[in-house]
Structure formats: structure tokens, C-alpha cells
Amino acid sequence: MKISVRIHWFRRDLRLFDNAALFQALSGNEPVVPIFIFDTAILNQLEDKNDRRVAFIHRALEDMQQQLIKIGSSLEVYTGTPFDVFQQLIKKYSISAVYTNHDYEPYAIERDTAIANLLSSAGISFYTSKDQVIFEKLEVTKDDGTPYTVFTPYANKWRATLEKTGIPAYPSEKKSAQFFQQSPLPMPSLKSIGFIDKGESFPSDTPQMEVMKHYQQNRDIPSLANGTSRLGVHLRFGTISVRQLATKAKATSATFLNELIWRDFYHMILFNFPKVGRGEAFKKAYDAIPWRNNEAEFKRWCEGKTGYPIVDAGMRQLNATGFMHNRVRMITASFLVKHLLIDWRWGEAYFANKLLDFDLAANNGGWQWAASSGCDAAPYFRVFNPTLQTQKFDPQHKYIREWVPEWQELTYPQPMVVHEVARKRVLEVYSTALKQN
């Protein structure tokens, strides 16, 4: 006779504490089987078998497994398509319900619709919860119920809504007795799923209060090791709780909280305007820009050999570590799009492959902001001057010296394009294209 259970499906919520869907699952009478699926539909698209994100996920799963073993349970880790895995699980267990947390990306919505239909046909309930953002979908809207497309009024409404609702807690860690009891199950190795374990070290998942306190003064200085929190990857995969982080930010730093509001804003945009996740400009007129798309110039940008030290430092940091400081992300993105007139989608895809903290909503939002094609984006005539940005945010060249030690040597390349010439060119190209559309 099959055992009657509930299932919690971990995805972007790799933690046992303050987990909304897990809390709901553990609040019933049936034991909860925790599962994770290495989705081959996603893994097969990753060309780099040293992918840091897969290694990060694997490390997070190992940590959860050790916590579960201590309470007599075990994480069940599968490799395959979610559809195939759930067909197996339906045969293995008598499942009353499956619980998981919302995901707002186009692929995830299609996947979850297919799984919901499969489970429904087997008489199994499928419950999803809000967990990776504070406010989602249409929870913060204009007075007429339509989604905001400008950040400042959205942020004001977001804060007002937070004052009314507060931030809920879902203490799933207090209900651990409801986990299904079983002997420890083996964890698949990275090698067994086709990836290489390089023993990567990852940023701490502990929010540093000193970083938050001085965030407004320090956040734009790329040479400061503690100028930013480095929590992006933990928010991406849910190894920390965005609710707990927002609670600390609200009490400590309005500027830090504002970054979490930007994160909610871009997730809201992706959900309500899914075209942006399919490579379309938010502002359709900008799809008419005649990009130069010079492959040799794109290669130099990718490799950090543009002749602009601040741009090259950012790209080299990204290639070496999977991280790039946010101020430098804006500078490098602006340079690719505005100085080189290379399609923002090329840069978006490169960042998507390299960033440890890659998040579709935020990455797309950032690139469309730089290209001026996004909602509430920088105006097209705003072209970052890399030299002035360096003078303002790395005046002693500490960041540049770390990543481009040869920047003052004769071997360092000359700027691949003169700023004033590039600025004049992009303004003419944008102006002409937008007038025609």
C-alpha cells in the first residue's frame, strides 16, 4: 500500500525557514516529502559545465540535506523533466497535494501549468505561494487596477501598501516534525548531472548590518569589498528570506529597501508584460534601432579589452568571478549599447550566462534601462562617459588596478571608440529611428 503524503517542491526557495509554501505543506496532518528536480530542460541549455549557479544550487541542497537528516528526513533529488519526475512520484506515493512557491518567468509559468494539469488529472491538488518577492503580480497597482510602468509612483504605493499589510512570517522551521521520516538518500554529484565541481566559494548568506547602515554612501564604489551586500545570488535561489531581509532593511536603510522595491518592480513587469522575457523591447519603437552588431567589437567587450579601464575591469571581474558591481553593470551595459551600438539582447544573453546572481526579471530590466527601451528607462540621450564615471566612482583607480593591472602600460589597448564620436553617432541613430517610428 502506498503511503499518503504531501510533497513540497523546492525551486527558488532553497531553505527550510520562513518558507511560505513549505509552511503551508507542513501545516497539514500528512507527512511532507521534500523534493528538488534538476530540470534537464534548463541544464541542457547551459553550455559551460563549470556553471557556478549549478554548483551553488548543489551546495545549497547539500546544506538542506544535512539539516533534514538531523531530523530523520531526507531530500529527494531527481534529474529529468518535472513532468517525467511527477509521473514517477504519482506511482511511488499516494499524493494528496503538491506545494511550491510562485515563479514568474515565462518558462516557469508554462512548466507549472503543465504540472498542474498532470496532477489534476490524477486528483492531486497543486498549491503555489508567494515567497520570492514582497508584492507580486497586481498587488501594487494604479488606482484603476492597471500595473505601474514608472518606478517612483510604484515605489510610493509599494511603501504605503507595506505600512498597511506588514510583512508576514512563515515559520516553517517550527513544523519540522511533519517531514516524512526516511533514511538518508544519496545526493547526486555535480559530475553525475554533467557538471564540474571546482570547489567554488560563494558570498555569505548573512545580511551585514554595517553594509546596510552605510549602503547609501558606499553602494556606488566598486573597490569596496563591503559596499554592497552580495546577497543577490541568495535572493535568486531563496537561500535567504526576502521577507526577513526587507524587515531588516526597513529598520536600517531606506536606500537598501529601495533596491528590494526595484526587484519587486521588475518581477511585476515581467509577469504583466511577458514579452520582455521573450526578447522584445518594452517600448516597441526601440525595436527599430539599426544596431551595428560588430562581432569583433562584441568580443573585445566580452573579454574586457575595450581600452576603457572601468569597462574592462567590470567585464574581467564578471568573467573571473561571476559577479560585477551594480554601478559597473550600468557602465558596461551603456558602453555596449550606446558606444558600440550593439543590440542590448547580446549583452543581456552574455550576462545571463555569466552572472552568479542572474535573474531574468532584473537582468532584462537593467539591460532595457541601459538601452532606453525599457519602462522608466534612461532617456536615449543619456550616454555614460566611462572616464567621468571613473573619476566619480573609482578616482584612485583601486578597482581598475585590481582587474586591469596593465591599464597604464603601453601594452594596454587604445580606446576602441572615442566617447564624443560614439555619443554623436548613437544620438543620430536613435533620433532617426525613433522619428520614423
Give the ranges of each region predicted by the language model.
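Trp/Phe/Arg-rich N-terminal binding region typifying the photolyase-homology
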Residues: M1-L162, T252, R316, E428-A433, ...
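Short alpha-helical segments used as structural interaction elements across diverse proteins
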Residues: H8, M324-N326, E420
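Hydrophobic alpha-helical segments, especially transmembrane helices
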Residues: R12, D112-T113, D264, V328-M330, ...
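Alpha-helical packing segments of well-folded alpha/beta enzyme cores
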Residues: A21, A60, M64, Q208, ...
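Glycine/tryptophan-enriched, flexible segments
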Residues: I124, G145-Y286, Q389-N437
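Active-site-proximal binding-pocket segments
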Residues: I124, L224-R401
